[in-house]
């Protein structure tokens, strides 16, 4: 008679099969043309997920106001097939809201002739979705295995002169620790947007970001 593997072995085999079926994330740092020029951006030795530029010794305290250009979606043809037009609009709107939430705590909205203003540009440039159905099954056996992700490009300008002060390109991929995000197609992407908006704000207002996190 053929012996039946124990339940633990069956679960392990099923988990390996699910892992093989789960899609690998394809998000990475991008150079879509949204920023116009990328020559100034340099790798970060502490974080391989980012490229960044910051103007030397610009007077951050002089800027008290902020304006935002609407976030755009700048996907490759491959990524465009992963997401509907409505979902693209919703991701852009999520990024808009995240930027306003982060920066309007530190800056007054709008431009003024009495003080310096920043203008922030943002683009969602890469996307990878999670598979909630696959993650429900794999979560019952072991843990969610299909992780989403997002790539973004940001630019901070002097609103009056148009001079570039900061440019940031980054990407995030979901992890096994982000369990809740695994059960939404864009849960990991939204977490990535939150992360990179916080990183951008940290660069613009490092002291305030540190104080707020304490």
Language-model features, listed with the residues they occupy:
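Bacterial N-terminal signal peptides that target proteins for export
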Residues: 2-14
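C-terminal motif of bacterial Sec signal peptides marking the signal peptidase cleavage site
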Residues: 20-23
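A structural "domain/chain start" motif
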Residues: 25-93, 205-214
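Sec-exported extracytoplasmic/periplasmic mature domains
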Residues: 73, 96-108, 129, 201-208
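Second-shell loop/turn segments in exported
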Residues: 79-90, 107-109, 179-187
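Stable alpha-helical elements in mature extracytoplasmic
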Residues: 91, 95, 99, 120, ...
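Surface-exposed short loop/turn segments
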Residues: 105-163, 174-180
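Short secondary-structure boundary motifs at beta->alpha junctions and helix caps
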Residues: 151, 160-203
């Amino acid at each position: 008679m053929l012996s039946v593997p124990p339940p633990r072995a069956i679960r392990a085999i099923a988990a390996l099969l699910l892992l093989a079926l789960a899609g690998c994330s394809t998000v990475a740092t991008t150079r879509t043309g949204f920023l116009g020029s990328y020559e100034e951006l340099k790798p970060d030795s502490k974080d391989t997920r980012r490229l960044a530029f910051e103007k030397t010794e610009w007077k951050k305290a002089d800027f008290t106001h902020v304006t935002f250009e609407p976030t755009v979606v700048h996907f490759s043809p491959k990524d465009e097939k992963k997401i509907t037009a409505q979902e693209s609009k919703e991701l852009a709107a999520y990024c808009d809201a995240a930027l306003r939430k982060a920066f309007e705590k530190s800056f007054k909205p709008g431009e003024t002739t009495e003080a310096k203003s920043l203008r922030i540009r943002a683009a969602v440039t890469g996307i990878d979705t999670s598979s909630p159905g696959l993650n429900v099954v794999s979560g019952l056996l072991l843990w969610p295995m299909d992780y989403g992700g997002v790539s973004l490009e940001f630019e901070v300008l002097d609103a009056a002169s148009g001079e570039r002060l900061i440019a940031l390109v980054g990407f995030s991929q979901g992890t096994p620790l982000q369990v809740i995000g695994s059960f939404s197609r864009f849960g990991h992407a939204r977490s990535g947007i939150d992360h990179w908006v916080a990183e951008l704000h940290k660069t613009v207002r490092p002291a305030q970001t540190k104080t707020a996190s304490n």
